[in-house]
UniProtKB/Swiss-Prot annotation:
Main subcellular location: cytoplasm
Organism of origin: Aromatoleum aromaticum (strain DSM 19018 / LMG 30748 / EbN1) (Azoarcus sp. (strain EbN1))
An example Gene Ontology biological process: L-histidine catabolic process to glutamate and formate
Taxonomy of the source species: Bacteria, Pseudomonadati, Pseudomonadota, Betaproteobacteria, Rhodocyclales
Pfam families: Lyase_aromatic (PF00221)
Protein's name in the database: Histidine ammonia-lyase
Enzyme class name: lyase
Recorded superkingdom: Bacteria
Residues the record lists as 2,3-didehydroalanine (Ser) modifications: S144
Length: 526
């Protein structure tokens, strides 16, 4: 089990990937403890004073002007959680919920939500016991935070709802007992602090960012293999071309193609042929994939900032004793980042689909029609390409930005919302579709490279070819093809092909202790 020490405000992408996908145990930086205590004391003092403060002794949303008497403050927080637990749809995945828990813990531990350490310890207890609250995936509009899904997560602390433990579906009371916890009574503001925030949108976007990073690296490998399968030129990857444009992602993508294709015997065999220019799907790969890379890097930066943010409302400032209402719960940054990732994922798949079309077209590729030597009685990759085209078309619709939509809610008090949760959630389908398109391309490109025998591709890509053939044999006559596509797609999603790509992302680099973090902030800035 991997131990991850949470440093609120200074989490890294590598830590977030580890938390989501590894068997990890969370610890909290001790410097958080006095900060949390000061925030909780500030809220308790306001509650005792009777001074009106939103979320502490008032109603919520359009009911914010309603004063709540002291003897109903605990009931107010409980009712808030119960009334907001109205999510629908399939439950969020275990990696997503683990990340939601970690992000919520980190946000609360910065001391500006005014909750007690007891509440944070309960969330840590759930995580470390392997308890995964059952959180429906639909029902949030991304402002005021991810209310409905976070209410389902929070209800578990009250002994209400359901969870998963070791794959078993159990009631909340049993889940709490497994974690060594009893149902809690929430203090002033604690229910609101649990529900307010962008942690669900952010966790969804991060989990799918990590999937799209794997897809991107796989696409570089598949695209390079297709260059050799189509007997394409290496000249478009020359560093001098890309330096003149200066786009960072393009420069990095071109360098990756050069590394992947270095030493190709196929290229040497046709280096002096009369072909002048390849189709764009081969020649412009650095430009298209580089633009995707720049989008992904920007989205990752935005999401990392949000993962370290306090997106609660109102916010507690212990130094001045103030509680300030704002709008940090609005998910627009997450929605924009997710929409940018959607564009990148769709374009990765669109370019791969075009390369498949090129490979099966004998006129363009110089290979046998549909990549099978005895065409006619055999249809080869004809309909596998149709599947890729169908998925690429779906991706175009899924790439439509969710953030441009808004519906007013809460009697027009919440009159503009981000739709960040949907923007982040649909990335999963985009990543999955694109992984399947790439599986088909890898199979087609492997077929094309083998049809170039006796010439061989580069040493790096020969290893990729060996991986493909360890799962799926050469296609010489028609056979039941769906299991082959599924087998390679599983390897794509698991990162087996991405590991052959020399380019990597920040989330895949193991943090080098404190060197990977910004300077340690003082307690008040945690």
């Amino acid at each position: 089990m991997t131990a991850v020490c949470l440093h609120p405000g200074r989490l890294t992408l590598a830590e977030l990937r580890t938390i989501a996908f590894s068997d990890s145990r969370l610890e909290l930086e001790p410097a958080c403890f006095p900060v949390v205590a000061r925030g909780a004391a500030t809220v308790a003092a306001i509650a005792r004073s009777g001074e009106p403060a939103y979320g502490i002794n008032t109603g919520f949303g359009r009911l914010a002007q309603t004063h709540i008497p002291d003897d109903q403050l605990e009931l107010l927080q409980k009712n808030l959680v119960l009334s907001h637990a109205v999510g629908v749809g399939e439950p969020l995945s275990a990696p997503t919920v683990r990340l939601v828990l970690a992000l919520k813990i980190a946000s609360l531990a910065r001391g500006h939500s005014g909750v007690r350490m007891e509440l944070i310890n309960a969330l840590l207890g759930l995580f470390n016991a392997g308890v995964i609250p059952r959180v429906p995936s639909k029902g949030s509009v991304g402002a005021s935070g991810d209310l409905a899904p976070l209410a389902h997560l929070s209800a578990l602390l009250l002994g209400i709802g359901e969870a998963y433990v070791d794959g078993r579906h159990v009631p909340a009371t049993e889940a709490l007992a497994i974690a060594g916890l009893a149902p809690m009574t929430l203090a002033a503001k604690e229910g609101l602090a649990l529900l307010n925030g962008t942690q669900v949108s952010t966790a969804l976007a991060l989990v799918n960012l990590f999937a799209i990073e794997t897809v991107f690296r796989t696409a570089l490998v598949a695209g390079a293999l297709s260059v050799d399968a189509a007997a394409g030129s290496f000249k478009p990857f020359d560093a001098r071309i890309h330096a003149l444009r200066g786009q960072p992602g393009q420069i990095d993508a071109a360098a990756t193609y050069r590394q992947l294709l270095e030493g190709s015997g196929i290229n040497l065999a046709h280096r002096d042929c009369g072909k002048v220019q390849d189709p764009y799907s081969l020649r412009c790969q650095p430009q298209v994939m580089g633009a995707c890379l720049d989008q992904m890097r920007h989205a990752a930066r935005v999401l990392l900032i949000e993962a370290n943010a306090v997106s609660d409302n109102p916010l507690v400032f212990p130094d001045s004793g103030e509680v300030l209402s704002g709008g940090n719960f609005h998910g627009e940054p997450v929605a924009f980042a997710a929409d940018a990732l959607a564009l990148a994922a769709a374009e990765i798949g669109a370019l791969a689909e075009r390369r498949i079309a090129l490979l099966i077209d004998a006129t363009l590729s110089g290979l046998p029609p549909f990549l099978v030597t005895e065409g006619g009685v055999n249809s080869g990759f004809m309909i596998a390409h149709v599947t890729a085209a169908a998925l690429a078309s779906e991706n175009k619709l899924l790439a439509h930005p969710a953030s441009v939509d808004s519906l007013p809610t809460s009697a027009n008090q919440e009159d503009h919302v981000s739709m960040s949760t949907f923007a982040a959630r649909k990335l999963g389908e985009l990543a999955d579709n694109t992984a399947t398109i790439l599986a088909i391309e890898l199979l087609a490109a492997a077929q094309g490279v083998e049809l170039r025998a006796p010439h061989r591709t580069s040493p790096r890509l020969q290893a990729v070819l060996a991986l493909i053939r360890s799962r799926v044999p050469h296609y010489d006559i028609d056979r039941y093809f769906a299991p082959d596509i599924a087998s390679i797609k599983d390897e794509v999603s698991a990162g087996a092909f991405a590991r052959h790509c020399p380019l990597s992302f920040d989330s895949e680099r193991v943090a080098d202790g404190e060197a990977s973090r910004s300077a340690t902030p003082d307690d008040e800035s945690l």
